[in-house]
Amino acid sequence: MDDQPINIVTDIKNAICKDDLDSFIILMENNPSINLFCEPDKQSIDFGGIIQPIEFCKNNDLIKMVNEVDDQLIDHYISTVLREEVIKNCSVKILKYLFDMGLPVDFGRNFSIRLCSTKYLGSNHYIKENPGQDTLSLLRLLIEYGVDVNAHNYLPLYSAVSSKNFDKVKLLVENGANVLRVANGNENSFYFKIDSIKYLLDNGVEIDMNLSRALFLSIKDNSIECIQFYLELGADINKISPMDIIGLIKLRNIVGIRLLIENGFDFTSLNKLAGNNNERIIDVLINEANVDISALLKILLEFW
């Protein structure tokens, strides 16, 4: 690799940041060893003679081979960093030029669609919001060049719904996104987004989510709308335990309780729950102080 002055790479990054295509092309043409048009991730590094038994190599040969490998790794690193900068800065003009020059739209294991959808992949990988540059325009360009909208286990649609970006959700669905996959443990940030989920269902998108968990969270949140929605979607009410509905009782949510009754929840399971507990103050009040059960229940509900 030719030695690359730091200021050359910096100049290229500045052109990317401004989406200055003319300056970018001039810099790239004047520095041909920086190649952003291929996909280093899919190339094999030529280790040359390093494949042969190490004892047959002379010291000078080893140093030369190590330097050659280092040069290739540095080339790949610079190329990868600069290409990622194009995505992070939403540099649509430059990205279009790179695609036209042969850069695969799925470079870097679909780095572009992954970052464009979520805007944040880690401390060093996040979208920089610049005036006149937006991720929706970037997503349109990626789709125009044939990006897989269901890449990385349906991550794009998941990220768009998660970030509450309906324009992206709509664009992805219109271009073939067909599964919303919510992994176990992530329902907490999704169960209440029923408007987006309704839109997806109306447009034939498969919802791959733990509905019973979503129902539990809806009950816990005391949300009538969400409870009804997930019951209608087929959430298994038998997965709800007696302890899960205590909050509805405590908050006097009559509508929610009736919804559960109408959908087959067995409230007599509360009797078993109470019977399994050790002696408590309520047992003493009822059995030893002769307090009326109904009166005690009214008092508890009033001041709970």
Curated annotation (Swiss-Prot):
Keywords attached to this entry: ANK repeat, Repeat
Entries under Gene3D superfamilies matching the protein: Ankyrin repeat-containing domain (1.25.40.20)
Keyword Mitochondrion recorded: no
Top-level lineage group: Viruses
Extent of the signal sequence: none
Keyword Zinc-finger carried by entry: no
Coiled-coil region list: none
Residue windows of the ANK repeats: 7-36, 77-107, 122-151, 152-181, 183-209, 210-239, 265-293
Protein name in the entry: Putative ankyrin repeat protein R598
Organism: Acanthamoeba polyphaga mimivirus
